[in-house]
């Protein structure tokens, strides 16, 4: 399956494959299409019975997929397939805290590639919150323990989903600068590759977690980087939606047009979990009913977007206008591919996967219904054949 086009070099034919990796509470599912993204094939469940909180299609090594998995009986692990999901094995030396640390590794929430200048590097964010690095494409892992040794560590407390490091962002021009998001602790930034870390939560309202450290106690749900300006970040927070224009030194609300926004003075700040940004700078998220209910407002599965250059959110798609959907979309279950026009994809807590290839105006549903969807990741593969 593929959409052929002339290659830029050698006169070959480049075939684009679009894969969607969907992690659920009962395994991983894979969807595949061509660049048109109209017809999809499905495979799975892979890793049946395992929770899959994170998934990464490793473009540096063929059909390699890495997953962060957990099981109520067997615990957490990183599992890898070298053939696109056909066979799986556990990485023996996966992320693991030392006995002396006093921490317990419960889940692997995030696996991301390192900076493009470091093709063998991977990072993993885990619960209890910590950051691990692999310099050999995932074969072995080491903790970047300056983060867990931060002076505020005694004041870290979990959110409702656990004390998880769920977001890892790398500056595109400077591999030494990274940001991480921890629930319900806050944002940290390093400017020296993880040797030291500083809190970056100015402008956010603390949540009542009882910590004596004023620098932490901030429940960041998800963050993304502006594709054109890496000093600009966007955040879905427990108590609103925020932007930073100074590398996370400070944050300010961007809620105009959202239900519950401060400008319209409706009760409560906009609550939600995921936020995603396209390569063109369009933003997408899902406002939920409230922190208490955590389901779609009035049972309507509506996607909100802020187009590049705008300062206002708009409802860009009523996904299932004729049916109620009292569901949620979790923090890592919304993603956007890198094609043009871009595709937007998300999965719900009731196990449905929806997608749009026109900027969120029209939506289709993938065939099938699955377990509670934990993560949705795109993987673009380009195969070049000889002319």
Give the role of each language-model region.
Residues 1-387:
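Extracellular glycan-interacting surfaces
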